[in-house]
Amino acid sequence: MPEGTEVKPGVRIAEIRGRARAILSAERVALNFLQRLSGVATLTRAYVRAVEGTGVKILDTRKTTPSLRMLEKHATAVGGAMNHRFGLFDGMLIKENHAKVAGGLARAVEKAKARPLGLPLVAEARTVEEAEILATLGVDRILLDNFTPSQVTMTVRRLKALGKAGKLEGPRPATAKRAAKGGGTAVAAPESISSGGIPEIEVSGGIRLENIREFALPGVTYISVGALTHSAPALDLSLLVDDVS
């Protein structure tokens, strides 16, 4: 059965043949992988469906199980999400700690832009005011962290007002999309300035399946969800011997 196929309880998804000793020895490890990755893909599919029709894309995160990142990110892609960063090498993300170490948000962005790495530059905003500052600094994307839906709407409105007033920095040279390290999945890479005249907007923090639709608002391009990989329940799978001939 091809991966990504939706199944119902009781459906046989695969058949294997081999020596009984080998099959029974590998049973638990094989099921652990299948249950874990199928659970990630299943939860991801639910999030993707929750925002259908809005144009918003679901992103995974680096909050993955140690040593399983490549597999878990493949599972989120099978579920319909876009892969975010695989590591620190394929995108610059300025967060609160980076800003503190660099001497402030503006200084952190300045230092990042001074390095011609050809990587997308994303910066985290914790308030509407920080988002406004980042928009004037010319970042590719602004990550709104732990915003309420009303704060997201207010931020988009204010950024568009800044754009109309000509107060946003011009676009950086277009950032090439980078291929994912496995599975041929495209890594989400922002364009310099979105068609709306403002940096792309990503929303993260406090996002659950029950409320994600509330955050899929006009002006939002991405919603990143750590729960896809750090909180996905395992799919209930079992292996049964039915022929010993």
Predicted regions and their residues:
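Intrinsic disorder/low-complexity segments
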Residues: 164-198
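Active-site catalytic pocket residues across diverse enzymes, especially alpha/beta-hydrolases
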Residues: 159, 163
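Short secondary-structure boundary segments
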Residues: 146, 205, 227
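Extended hydrophobic secondary-structure segments
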Residues: 143-149
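Active-site loop ensemble at the mouth of alpha/beta enzyme cores that anchors a bound cofactor
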Residues: 238-245
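Acidic/glycine-rich phosphate/pyrophosphate-binding loops and surrounding catalytic core
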Residues: 1-126, 130-137, 141, 153-158, ...
